């Protein structure tokens, strides 16, 4: 995480921006919140969408416990892991498969990882697979990046973002979250809102991990802050 935050700060300096509005969606909200807590003097406002803490508990929720909502899809996801890796966390096992020297092993693991990604964000009957996963190069790169990050618990101490939320005091901002988000349950943004003085929690009742109504709210909030 230190390197990710340093990259953002280097970009800000390169662009000659003194203070800016930081926006993060999904894992980008983990990065955006962490950046704001470490460089609060450089953040004019902070907008987070589909927030999670990036902690081990949240990662285990997505890779294990969310399977209670999608049992058939999760069983397929889990069963792709060979017996000799079953004692590992699923995210660790998949990272090993994705880095296997055999391209066929890598590709099969990437397909199953992205299939599960599609499953746990599908909260409506008309949910469609993410078309980006049709690209084999993107699919493998995405799965590798996600598992590398998650197996390291986003390089954050447990619940670090919520515990350090007092550093966000004085920074105006909004947390926009779908009530039906099964990937990132509402308790994480609610706890951050409680710990972040002056923040606004916007709950979109009929959407999950993104959607048209949430995008509309994001645009509204960003326009109001600009």
Regions from the language model: what does each represent?
Residues 168-169, 175-177:
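Short beta-strand/loop motif that positions the catalytic acidic residue
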Residues 163, 199-226:
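Catalytic active-site module of serine/aspartate enzymes centered on a nucleophile-bearing elbow/loop
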Residues 2-20:
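Conserved acidic catalytic loop of the alpha/beta-hydrolase fold
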Residues 22-24, 49, 176:
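Short beta-strand immediately N-terminal to the catalytic nucleophile in serine-hydrolase-like folds
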């Amino acid at each position: 995480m230190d390197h990710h935050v340093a990259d953002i700060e280097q970009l800000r300096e390169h662009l000659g921006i003194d203070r800016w509005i930081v926006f993060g969606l999904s894992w980008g909200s983990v990065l955006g919140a962490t950046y704001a807590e470490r460089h609060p003097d450089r953040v004019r406002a902070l907008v987070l969408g589909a927030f999670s803490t990036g902690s081990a508990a949240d990662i285990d929720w997505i890779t294990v416990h969310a399977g209670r909502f999608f049992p058939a899809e999760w069983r397929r996801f889990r069963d792709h892991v060979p017996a000799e890796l079953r004692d590992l966390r699923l995210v660790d096992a998949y990272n090993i498969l994705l880095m296997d020297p055999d391209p066929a092993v890598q590709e099969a693991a990437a397909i199953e990882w992205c299939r599960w990604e599609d499953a746990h964000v599908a909260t409506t009957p008309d949910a469609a697979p993410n078309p980006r996963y049709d690209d084999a190069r993107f699919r493998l790169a995405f799965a590798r990046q996600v598992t590398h990050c998650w197996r390291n618990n986003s390089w954050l101490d447990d619940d670090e973002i919520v515990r350090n939320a007092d550093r966000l005091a004085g920074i105006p901002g909004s947390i926009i979250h779908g009530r039906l988000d099964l990937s990132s349950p509402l308790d994480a943004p609610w706890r951050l809102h409680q710990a972040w003085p002056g923040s606004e929690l916007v709950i979109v009742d009929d959407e999950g991990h993104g959607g048209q109504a949430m995008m509309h709210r994001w645009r509204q909030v960003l326009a109001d802050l600009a």
